[in-house]
Amino acid sequence: MVRGSNIFRSRYFLAGILLQLVAVFAVQAQKTAKKDTTIILLNDLTVQLQCSQALNDLYNFKFEKAEDNFRSLKQQYRWHPLPYFLMGLIEWWKIMPNTKDTSHDKQFLAYMDSTITIADNLYENYPEYKIEASFFLSAAYGFKGRLYSDEERRNWTKAASSGKDALDYLEESKTKQDLSPELLFGDALFNYFSVWVPENYPALKMILWMFPKGDKALGLKQLKEVSYNAFYTRTEAMVWLMRILNSYENDQPRAFDISRYLHETYPDNPFFHRYYARILYSMGRFTVAEPVCLNILERIDSAQLGYEATSGRYAAFFLGQIYEARKRPEDAKKYYKQCVKFANEIDADESGYALYSLIALGEIAEKEGNKAEAKKYFKEVKKKSGRKDEAFKTAKQRLKKLEKGD
């Protein structure tokens, strides 16, 4: 099993969560005292039918098919932000497998800016579309904030500005409710993380004092409702629910169910594929995890869209652990070395997967009586890790033990 449960978490993930509080689809619903004249294209069944297969194609990484459908939608509704936002969502999922790749940033931001421009026109000039315009304004600003806060971008000024804009539209619609299950998504994330963040990071309480009080239990309930009943936000809600249940709520069985569903429903999505492999591995279900991981590596070898070194690093490490547990050191070494190779390809040689692969290689070399090779691996870990890292401490102890034996 993985040693050190926190070693694989990006320290910038928290920043993404904070932006997410006021970001993704963060518009709450509307309560009306008179006959409702609000128009919601999101609720239009004809449009939903038109988008259904395209959304499936999007999440299954059939981007060209999805783009063709969304372009057709844009021809019909070029005055509405929906098609531009969906085109931007395609670019977002091109980024998701490897956030170190910035080649899609420009196009993604262009679509989000178009969404904002068109939604702002509706917001300012067409009262019947004001609620839906707020939805897209908050969503677009939120996604921009998430991108800017990513580890590879770290543009905190733009991230903060986008987060503030998203918050403004959240505040605009705070008193409104019961319009659409789509619009519960932002409220769900806010309710959950506005409580979770200060509970787990007390130092951030001062930053969050201006936020309304959330409710974690309600947030989870709302997130489940969106994952069951929404159309456009359903899959995004399931992704967040899976991650929350797995990482924060100690409900791995339920997270596993969602992960398996997402992988089986969208088998060509590399993010869902590797997350499924990750949960299988962490649950110790090695018999099932082995072919899943091997399939990831096969897809990388065949250059399948979205399958690259990030997914390979996961799969190779898990296979190394599986074969080491089965006392097959040669196979274990093969995949640990492959994990390190993948990590080097994406400049992630200081990541937990790479460091613990090196430690495992050193331990195997030590068991085989090759002290020189073992020392080489442990020294490499010390060189690439911080002094406070568990990997550094482990490598230091191993080296000390080896030196005593000389």
Predicted regions and their residues:
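Short coil turns that delineate tetratricopeptide repeat
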Residues: 78, 127-128, 178-179, 231-232, ...
